[in-house]
Swiss-Prot record:
GO terms for cellular component: plasma membrane. The lineage of its organism: Bacteria, Bacillati, Bacillota, Bacilli, Lactobacillales. This is UPF0316 protein EF_1609. Keywords: Cell membrane, Membrane, Transmembrane, Transmembrane helix. It is a multi-pass membrane protein. NCBIfam families: PRK04164.1-5. Belongs to the UPF0316 family. It is found in: Cell membrane. The keyword Lipid biosynthesis does not apply. InterPro entries: DUF2179 (IPR019264), DUF5698 (IPR044035), UPF0316 (IPR022930). The chain crosses the membrane at residues 1-21, 35-55, 62-82.
Amino acid sequence: MVVDLKMLAMIFIINFAYITLNTIRFMLTMKGYRVIAPLVSMAEITIYVLGLSMVLNRLDNPLNLLVYALGYAVGISVGIKIEDYLALGYIMVSVILPSTTEQFHLPETLREHGYGVTQSVAYGREGERMVLEILSPRKNERTLYKLINQLEPRAFIISYEPKFISGGFWTKKVRKRNDAISH
């Protein structure tokens, strides 16, 4: 059995590119990017057909299939990293604080850092709690978690991605606040 390194490299690169695009396209679709997702899918399917035909025409070499699978796995990993880097969309973070009196400074500190914070009082098994609702661009997600944990390490944090946002804090003022923070 002759090993064609050029062919193996082409199979890997093609499937790597296909799966990376597939992962990104899927995430764009889930975020509602209705124009760019179909455009990415056109490139994705073209690359897919090319790579698949290369492997199917050379099934006599099991190494081709192995490299195809390796390109698939690496493509998923890289696609996820790219999506994390792009950090499309927003997150909604709910923060439950141990008490309302000790942590009164936390909402104001978060606001000073440019976050929109809605606070309310809730009652848990051990009494009164302060609950914060924070909407943030995903690009700021890790920074927000670090800030909350620095200010209150006992905070209980839950985050999720909202499907629809309308009105409230998220107006043109957000850009102004972000610009002020970064300068």
